[in-house]
Amino acid sequence: MRLTELLNTENVTISCELFPPKQGAQLDNYKKIVGDMAALKPAYMSVTYGATGGTSDYTVELANEVRNVNHIPALAHLTCASSTKEKVASVIQELKEKQIENVLALRGDIPQNADFPLPNQYKHASELIYDIKSQGDFCIGGACYPEGHPESQTLEEDLIHLKEKVDAGCEFLT
């Protein structure tokens, strides 16, 4: 189910957010936790994405567990600050294969570690949203900052970037 269908009702929705494990050995335990949380019947469950790749390998797998095993709508986070376009395309393909249609597209934090190589292929989340939209029929969410993004010089600049997200295909903001 597309998240916009859930969010466009007058019902109050409660969701859960999962942080994937850093090591694959913990994955089975996390899948059990997903089942336990699904028993609470949240409207949807979101699965975060490790900005520096620390936990990103298990985002799609846990989102699959949410959607296809526990039958709860899944919202997979996808960040691009430290990703290549090829990596993003690969994740998008995995999401399509698992029929995970809800994606929260985020630029993500820029790693402060000078040893971490940054591909610098995405400057803004709007570019990621455009790539996701062009590669499939996804329900895409984006982040907004009522107080203004810390990197924006003005609220007007922040609103311009917010409009760019919507123009690129963002369907809901959080």
Predicted features along the sequence, with ranges:
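Alpha-helix-loop-beta-strand connector modules within alpha/beta enzyme cores
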Residues: 53-77, 120-143
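N-terminal amphipathic alpha-helix/helix-capping segment at the start of soluble metabolic enzymes
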Residues: 1-16, 23, 130
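Short, acidic/polar
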Residues: 24-37, 59, 85-93, 153-164
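Conserved, mostly hydrophobic/aromatic
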Residues: 17, 45, 95, 165, ...
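Conserved anion-binding
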Residues: 102-151, 155-157
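Active-site mouth loops of central-metabolism enzymes
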Residues: 13-29, 74-86, 141-157
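Glycine-rich, proline-tolerant flexible connector loops at the mouths of alpha/beta enzymes
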Residues: 41-62, 109-120, 170-174
